């Protein structure tokens, strides 16, 4: 997979330093290119009737802001600069350079925040990716005043107050309509709650590319729709066995729907054969809802289950399973004896959370798909603590138990045991509905039996799940979407894949 890199603030600083020190590109050249890139975007959005104001701190982010103000003035726009720390406060070397250049042109500087608040477009260049403390006091007053205006608000690289690594909001935070970030998206711009302050995020190239990693690639990446083009079309010379046999162990009394959703999503993701293991009481419901599924009911012994495991190429276990004694037997048997890849979801995770040693029993690759509540039980951490560092927690769990972890939230995080991580950027709030997780487990399982690659199945599975929800959003809206709508969206995704494929 060739995916979009997502960087932390520290990684971006290293890229800046490497570009200057190894490739000999002066830092001021990068700053000028950053400013020019932002100005190109602004000129494309706003005509010369608009008045601009740039709020500057005293670091390199402020240097970017001053350069933006200069270039806007030179392009015939009206733009003022407001120095939040005062005109006499010393700052970084590049800040001082840009401040002196701006002064030579004698462009407008104001000392009254009220002048700024009367502008049509207000640009935040107060703090960049290096901010590690809460914004309080007079600086908070400045941001608060600006946030109350009707002006368009633009952030340079990151909105001031957003932690560029974890998405925390640190004190009073600039509320942007647009964020122009440099070279690569920052993790904090994508995670909640920081993402709520970013508006539309656009990457502005400044002359830094993958060469500057010097082999030290970031651990976090993301998929987008262009990555669907990397998926191969199904071969014409094939049969149902070509595309894998998936065993879905799901459902309990009154929970037949979970089995149906997971199995149907697997079929709609290309699995050749899907067999459902479920209680006999679910037979009529499942056969009516999904006649394509094979059915095996009332597995009462480990030996009987092992026979079914021998048939399959991969297993999904957990949706609607309950925590009954029989369910516990099924989970324990799968973990101890299965010699095929596993997708573990829902009640199977809840069973494991009562006896974490079970997760050390697996012989083959495992994908776990917990939501925050299930991860809280698995890790014995509060949901709040998990949200403080959702990428780190997913990575820790994956490494600790040698699994691929799909941690479901507003931004689902996929973490592999080898340290590689993905942020899923597809999906919408309509997908926060009963059964959505069952659909995800089926998609991942359906891809897994075809590809036999847990990392690829997990990353693409999460992305395709979200994209399917996006595909049907116009028809359902956020209030009307249900899990089966997401399955309907899979048809649209695969049509797109086949039209754009090789």
Predicted regions and their residues:
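Amphipathic alpha-helical segments in well-structured domains
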Residues: 95, 99, 139-143, 176, ...
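Internal gly/pro-rich beta-alpha loop/helix module
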Residues: 120-121, 126-218
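Glycine-rich phosphate-binding loop
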Residues: 112, 120-134, 315-322, 412
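Short beta->alpha connector loops at strand-helix junctions that form conserved
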Residues: 83-85, 113-116, 183, 296-299, ...
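Nucleotide and nucleotide-moiety/phosphate-recognizing core
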Residues: 39-125, 134-156
């Amino acid at each position: 997979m060739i995916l979009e890199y997502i960087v932390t603030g520290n990684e971006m600083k290293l890229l800046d330093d490497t570009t200057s020190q190894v490739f000999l590109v002066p830092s001021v050249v990068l700053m000028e290119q950053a400013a020019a890139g932002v100005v190109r975007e602004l000129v494309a959005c706003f005509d010369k009737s608009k008045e601009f104001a740039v709020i500057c701190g005293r670091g390199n982010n402020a240097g970017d802001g001053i350069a933006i103000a200069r270039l806007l003035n030179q392009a015939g726009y009206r733009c003022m600069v407001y120095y939040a720390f005062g005109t006499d406060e010393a700052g970084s070397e590049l800040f001082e350079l840009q401040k002196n250049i701006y002064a030579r042109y004698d462009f407008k500087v104001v000392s009254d925040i009220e002048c700024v608040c009367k502008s049509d477009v207000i640009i935040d260049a107060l703090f960049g990716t290096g901010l590690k403390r809460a914004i309080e006091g007079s600086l908070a007053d400045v941001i608060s005043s600006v946030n109350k205006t009707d002006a368009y608000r633009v952030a340079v690289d990151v909105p001031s107050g957003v932690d560029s690594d974890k998405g925390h909001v640190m004190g009073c935070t600039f509320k942007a309509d647009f964020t122009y970030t440099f070279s690569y998206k920052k993790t904090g711009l994508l995670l909640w709650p920081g993402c709520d302050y970013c508006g539309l995020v656009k990457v502005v190239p400044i002359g830094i590319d993958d060469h500057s990693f010097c082999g030290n690639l970031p651990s976090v990446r993301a998929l987008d729709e262009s990555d669907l083009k990397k998926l191969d079309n199904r071969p014409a010379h094939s049969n149902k066995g070509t595309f894998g046999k998936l065993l879905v162990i799901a459902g309990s009394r009154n929970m037949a729907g979970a089995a149906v959703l997971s199995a149907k999503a697997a079929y709609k993701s290309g699995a050749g054969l899907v067999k459902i293991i479920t209680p006999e009481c679910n037979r009529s419901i499942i056969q009516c809802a999904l006649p394509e599924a094979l059915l095996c009911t009332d597995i009462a012994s480990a030996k009987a289950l092992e026979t079914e495991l021998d048939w399959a190429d991969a297993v999904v276990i957990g949706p609607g399973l309950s925590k009954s004694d029989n369910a516990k037997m099924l989970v324990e048997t799968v973990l101890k004896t299965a010699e095929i890849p596993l997708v573990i979801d829902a009640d199977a995770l809840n069973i494991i959370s009562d006896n974490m040693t079970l997760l050390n029993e697996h012989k083959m690759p495992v994908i776990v798909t917990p939501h925050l509540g299930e991860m809280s039980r698995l890790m014995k951490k509060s949901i709040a603590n998990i949200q403080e560092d959702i990428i780190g927690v997913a990575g820790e769990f994956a490494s600790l138990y040698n699994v691929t972890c799909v941690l479901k939230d507003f931004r689902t995080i996929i973490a592999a045991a080898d340290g590689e991580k993905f942020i899923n950027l597809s999906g919408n709030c309509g997908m926060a509905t009963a059964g959505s997780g069952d659909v995800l487990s089926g998609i991942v399982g359906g891809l897994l039996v075809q590809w036999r690659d847990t990392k690829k199945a997990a990353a693409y599975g999460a992305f395709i799940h979200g994209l399917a929800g996006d595909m049907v959003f116009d028809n359902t809206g956020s209030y009307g979407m249900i899990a089966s709508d997401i399955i309907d969206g899979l048809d649209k995704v695969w049509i797109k894949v086949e039209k754009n494929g090789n």
